[in-house]
């Protein structure tokens, strides 16, 4: 409804009182809930056990450095220099268990101390975390998506190459292979690779390592199924999957010797697969 003109103005007779005090404000209150979850799951103890005996100590401790990097990623940081923007946030310091955050150079030197051995320990830490969570979810089937991902890098990074990033052709990048649970998005395993590698290269050793991890994590291996793109349509991968007795779905490339176009043109009956998606099944023995 229309307001009276006399009801719109407000009288201001003096200055607003301002009081300055030492008040600890934060922009990342959600870290407290995350921190409680980590304490309940004894995350710090897991980190110390995994990295025991490695040269990753330092003044801050390995658990504090790991939690600081986790906090940096959670709040949206993408570069080590972004740690400086979090130095005065009390909840970030509380989450990391530190009274004072390290400088970006200190974090960089700590990361440079990583070797292939300590990277393997990091894989063990991730496997241990997922191994605790996944059985408790009671999933009847576990769908594992295996695919290559693009990680952009700086200009002076070893084994990073230009031209292989489909969205940023001029940006150097890595091309790691990653496996995650489709139902929950938990990352099971990741392995870094050069930026110019084919997606299916070295996929079989990665799948073997992933399977060893699943044997120790999943109670019903018959309920495991894999999903992969066309780069994994290889004889060695298909034989390996068939030998494990698991379900799988792999995109089939349009190789000329498959002559899939002819089957598509002549197929009369298509069955619905998903909303706005239909298909048909084809069983045929082929030799390339």
Could you tell me what each predicted segment is?
Residues 1-198, 203-219, 244:
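Dynamic "connector" segments at or just before major functional cores
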Residues 2-16, 20, 247-288:
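An anionic, glycine-rich sequence signature occurring as long contiguous blocks
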Residues 143, 225, 247:
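Hydrophobic "anchor" residues on beta-strands that sit immediately upstream
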Residues 147, 221-233:
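Acidic/histidine-rich, metal-coordinating catalytic segments
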Residues 152-154, 232-236, 258:
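Active-site-proximal flexible loops/turns
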Residues 157-164, 235-253:
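A short alpha/beta connector and helix-capping loop motif
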Residues 206, 236-240, 263:
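Alpha-helical scaffold elements adjacent to nucleotide-binding pockets in ATP/GTP-utilizing enzyme cores
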């Amino acid at each position: 409804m229309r307001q009276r003109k006399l009801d719109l103005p407000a009288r201001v007779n003096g200055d607003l009182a301002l009081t300055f005090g030492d008040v600890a404000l934060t922009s990342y209150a959600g870290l407290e809930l995350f921190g409680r979850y980590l304490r309940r799951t004894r995350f710090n103890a897991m980190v110390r056990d995994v990295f025991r005996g490695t040269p990753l100590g330092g003044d801050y401790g390995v658990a504090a450095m790991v939690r600081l990097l986790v906090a940096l990623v959670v709040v949206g940081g993408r570069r080590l220099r972004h740690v400086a923007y979090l130095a005065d946030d009390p909840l970030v310091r509380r989450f990391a268990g530190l009274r004072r955050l390290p400088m970006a150079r200190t974090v960089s030197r700590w990361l440079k101390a990583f070797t292939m051995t300590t990277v393997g320990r990091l894989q063990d830490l991730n496997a241990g975390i997922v191994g605790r969570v996944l059985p408790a979810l009671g999933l009847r089937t576990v769908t594992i998506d295996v695919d290559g991902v693009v990680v952009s890098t700086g200009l002076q990074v070893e084994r990073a190459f230009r031209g292989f990033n489909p969205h940023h052709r001029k940006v150097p990048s890595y091309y790691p292979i990653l496996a995650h649970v489709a139902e929950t998005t938990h990352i099971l395993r990741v392995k870094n690779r050069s930026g110019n590698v084919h997606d299916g290269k070295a996929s079989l050793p990665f799948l073997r390592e992933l399977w060893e991890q699943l044997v120790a994590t999943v109670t019903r291996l018959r309920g495991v199924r894999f999903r992969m793109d066309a780069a994994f349509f290889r004889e060695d991968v298909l034989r390996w999957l068939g030998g494990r007795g698991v379900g799988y779905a792999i995109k089939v490339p349009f190789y000329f010797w498959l002559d899939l176009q002819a089957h598509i043109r002549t197929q009369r009956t298509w069955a619905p697969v998903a909303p706005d998606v239909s298909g048909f099944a084809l069983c045929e023995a082929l030799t390339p």
